[in-house]
Amino acid sequence: MTTSVALDWVVQDGQRLAECRHDHPFSLLGPQSHEGQWIVRIWMPEASQVELLCDGRTTAMTTPNHSWIFEAALNQDPGRTYQLRVKRAGIVHEQHDPWAFHDEWMGEMDRHLFAEGNHHHIWQRMGAHLMEREGVEGVMFCLWAPRACSVAVLGELNGWDGRHHPMQRRQGGLWELFIPGFKEGTLYKYEIRTQDGHCYQKADPYGFQHEVRPATSSVVARLDRYQWQDEQWMRQRDSRNALDQPISVYEMHLGSWIHAATDEPYIELDGTPRAPVLAADMKPGARLLTYPELADQLIPYVKDRGFTHIELMPISEHPFDGSWGYQVTGWYAPTSRFGSPDEFRAFVDRCHAEGLGVIIDWVPGHFPKDGHGLAFFDGTHLYEHSDPRIGEHKEWGTLIFNYSRNEVRNFLVANLVYWFEQFHIDGIRVDAVASMLYRDYLRPDGEWIANEDGGRENTEAVRFLQQANHVLFQHFPGALSIAEESTTWPMVTQPTDMGGLGFNLKWNMGWMHDMLDYFELDPWFRQFHQNNITFSIWYTYTENFMLALSHDEVVHGKSNLLHKMPGDDWQKCANVRALLAYMWTHPGKKTIFMGMEFGQRSEWNVWGDLQWELLTHDPHKGLQKLVDDLNTFYKAEPALWKDDFDQYGFQWIDCNDNRHSIISFMRRESSGGTWLVVVANFTPQSHSNYRIGVPIGGYYEEVFNTDSSCYGGRNLGNMGGKNTDEFNIHGYEQSLELCLPALSVLVFRHDPKRSL
C-alpha cells in the first residue's frame, strides 16, 4: 500500500537525501503517524528490494515516489525494534532501522551546559557511544557543527558512502544519529557539507580512538571496560598537598626512548598478532614499543632511577611524528601508535602500582591545519578565530583556539577532566602558555590585534586558563598543573580566586637559561658571571617553581647536555654532575629529559632512540648512578622539598665568592627536622682548606659528594665528615674547614648525636 503523502514533498526530500543535503531525515524517515495509519519509510541507497519484518510478519516495502525511498503502511505503531531485509547487488542482509530511534540523545540540560561552556563531562554525550537501545545494539553519534548544511556518518559498514546515514540536526548546532550494527572497532568519519556546497571528511573531535598514522579515521571504542586497580593511589593522591611532596620528573617521548626490531612480534591481549608500527621511514628495521612493552621496560627503569613521576610528551593522537605530538588532531584519544586506549590505561595503572605518578603534556594553545582535524570544521572558522591576526601562529603553521566561544572552551576544559577521569593521570604540563597569554606573541607590528583595552594581553585565554585550572582542582584536588610560561606574567601559580592563573607549578625558564649559560662558560671565566647561579634565589618565592632541563634544550643545534660543558671528557662529566646536584639541592621541584640521566652524547632525535650503548662505558654508568642516588637522597631529606615555596627553606651562607666560583647555602624545613649544608665548587681547582660558617657547632656528616669514584669522580672529600671550629666567618661563630674537590657539590648534615 502506498501513502497519500504529497508526492512532490517526498520527491524533493529524496533528491536532497541522494545529494547528501538533507538535515532533518527524521521528518521523513522511520515510523510516521499519518491519517490513522503508521507509515514506515526508509532510505536505502542502491537497494533493489526491501522487506519490513515486524511482529512476525513480512511486509514488502514499495518505492512509489523515489527509487531509494521504501515505505510500508501498518495499522499500528511498529515500535523501534522491527528489522529490514535488504537486497543490494544480489546480496541479502537483515538490519535494524537507524531512523526508528527519533528521540533526542542530548538532553535539554546537556545542551544548556554545553552552550554556556560548563559541561565538564560533555564527552559522555559527544562522539561515538556503544549502547543498546530497546534491545538493539549499535552506536550513537553526536557532533557539534552548527553551520553545516548537512552531516552524515561514513564508515566501513556503509562503504564510506555519505548517502546511507544522514544525521538529524538538533538544537544548538548538534547532529545525532543512532546506527544499529556499528560495533566496537568500526572505522568512521563525518561527512560535512557546507553552506557553499563544499564537502569535508572529518575525524571525530570527541573520538576516543583513531587509526594509526598515516590513516586518519576515528575508531569506535569503549570507555567502560577497563578495571582499575589503583584505588589506594588515587585516594592518597587527592588527600595530600602535592606541593609539600618530593617531585622528581623524568620527561620523555614514548616513541624515541627505545625501539624494538620489526621482527620482534607483539601479541595483543586477545591473542591476535599486532602489525608493527615503524619508528621512521629512515629506520625500516625498527618499530615502536607498545604500551604494554613500555610498561614492562620503562616503568622499572624510571623506578630504579628513583624518579617520582613520568612526564609524557603529548600522547593525544597526532598525524605527524615530527611535531613531537604538539600538533594534536585527536584530543580525546591516546595515540594508537603504541596501542589501544585500554592498554594506555593499563600503563598508567602499572605506574601507580610501582609508585610513579603520570604527567602528560597538554596543548590547548593551538592545533594543526590537517584536513581531517578541527580546522574550518563545518565550513566556517568554528574552533579558531577567523582573523589570522588572532587565529593563526604563522611561524608554527597552526591555528589558535577561539577561547571566547563557549563550546570551544567547553571542548578543552572537558578534555582536561576526561584525561584525569578516564586515564587516571596525575598532572598536566601546559605547553607554550606565553603564546596563549600575549596577542603579539612571535608577531611583528601590524600583524596582531589589541584587546578591548588596547593591550597585548589575551584576556580570553586568561579566562580560559583560569576556568580550566579551577575546574581541574575542583574535581581533582591532588593534581599537578604545570605551566611552561617563559615570561614574567604575574601570579601564574596563584589561585584563581586571588586573580592568578591557577597553576600550582611553573617551569623556571630563567633558572634554566642562567644555569646553561653559566655552565657553558670556561670555568676560569665563571667568576665574572656569579650572578647566573645566585640570581634565581632572589625571585624563587614569587611563584611555585619547577626546575626543568627539558627536551627543548637538546634539539635544534643546541647540542646535548654533556656537550654543552667545557673541558675534556672528565670535566664535561664533572660539570654535569655538579649541575644536576645543584639543581637537586636548589629550591623547586625537578624535571630532566630522558638521556640526560646517563649523558646522552647526541641531540635528541624524534625518529631515533637513546644511545643505550653508552651505558657500557664507566663515565656514563657514573652519571646514571649519580642521578639514582640524587633521587634517593632527595626523597629521604624533607629539607630538600618540604618547604620549597617558603623562604625559611633556604638560606645563603655565602654567595659572594665569585673569585673562586664557590657558593654555600643551607636547606631546612620549618617543622624543625634536619637541615643540610650545601657547598658547590664550579671550577677545576680543588681546595684543601676552604672555610664556611655554620650556625651550630658540632659534627657535620658528608652525606653526598659528586666527586665520589662511584660517579666517575676522583674521590676527594672529607673522610665522611668534619667537626666545627670556633672561627668566626660569614656571620657565624662556628665554621667548617673543608676539602672541596674540583667541579663538585658536597652536602653535609649536622649530626647532634656526635660530639665535637
From Swiss-Prot:
Annotated active site: 431 (nucleophile), 484 (proton donor)
InterPro entries tied to this protein: A-amylase/branching_C (IPR006048), Branching_enzy (IPR037439), GlgB (IPR006407), GlgB_N (IPR054169), GlgB_N_E_set_prok (IPR044143), Glyco_hydro_13_cat_dom (IPR006047), Glyco_hydro_13_N (IPR004193), Glyco_hydro_b (IPR013780)
Which GO BP terms sit in this record? glycogen biosynthetic process
Q: Pfam families under this entry?
A: Alpha-amylase, Alpha-amylase_C, CBM_48, GlgB_N
Q: In which pathway does it act?
A: Glycan biosynthesis; glycogen biosynthesis
Into which EC class is this enzyme placed?
Answer: transferase
Key word Transferase present: yes
Assembly and partners are described as: Monomer.
What the protein does comes down to: Catalyzes the formation of the alpha-1,6-glucosidic linkages in glycogen by scission of a 1,4-alpha-linked oligosaccharide from growing alpha-1,4-glucan chains and the subsequent attachment of the oligosaccharide to the alpha-1,6 position.
Q: What is the official name of this protein in its record?
A: 1,4-alpha-glucan branching enzyme GlgB
Gene field: glgB
